Design a protein with these regions (language model features):
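The feature marks the mature, well-folded catalytic cores of soluble enzymes
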Residues: 1-185
Length: 185
């Protein structure tokens, strides 16, 4: 499921498919909804929206059929969707997330930087490979306490950090964006 702002899911895992009904119900008052049809699947953790560009990690939960449908259905809103190959990670947002409109936090070992030309890149600390998942909200970056070296890099770039404990989410390679759905005005 996707709406005109490029958020939502049609998950690849059968166990997650029932979630789409409640998410659609919650989003319907705020956005026009469009749906990804089978055989297309897309997990929210694979979707990175950067302005009018939507990057989808090609994973076990997201496929080319969904990317093609997203281009067809979201193109009328000015969005372009492209697939991104990943290496050794579950989802795209395990490897790269948006810090602000011009800056990304990235683990270069898990995703090719050529996909993100034109953005300033802040590298995770080499000892914190899972530290690339952050969530900008307002004037702050919500960021896991488990990655203090990467947090210090963000702070050195002038970002205000709001630290959170996500140890239980991390056990399933989850992070701050996994439990968040930000609806912009």
């Amino acid at each position: 499921l996707f709406h005109a702002r490029g958020h939502g899911v049609s998950p690849g895992a059968d166990s997650r498919k029932p979630e789409t009904k409640s998410v659609a119900q919650a989003l319907r008052p705020y956005r026009e909804l469009v749906f990804i049809e089978s055989p297309g699947t897309v997990d929210g953790g694979d979707v990175l929206v950067l302005g009018k560009n939507i990057y989808v990690g090609l994973s076990t939960g997201s496929n080319q059929s969904a990317i093609d449908q997203m281009n067809a259905k979201l193109g009328k809103y000015g969005y372009h969707t492209q697939g991104v190959e990943m290496h050794d990670c579950l989802h795209l947002k395990t490897a790269v997330t948006k810090v602000d409109d011009k800056t990304l936090l990235i683990n270069r070992k898990w995703v090719d930087v050529e996909n993100f030309e034109g953005y300033e890149l802040i590298d995770v600390d080499a000892s914190e490979p899972f530290g690339a998942n952050c969530l900008p909200v307002g004037d702050a970056i919500i960021f896991p306490v488990a990655f203090p070296k990467t947090s210090a890099k963000l702070a050195a770039h002038g970002y205000k950090i709001k630290s959170v404990v996500v140890d239980e989410l991390a056990k399933a390679e989850g992070a701050v964006t996994c439990c968040s759905l930000i609806i912009e005005n």
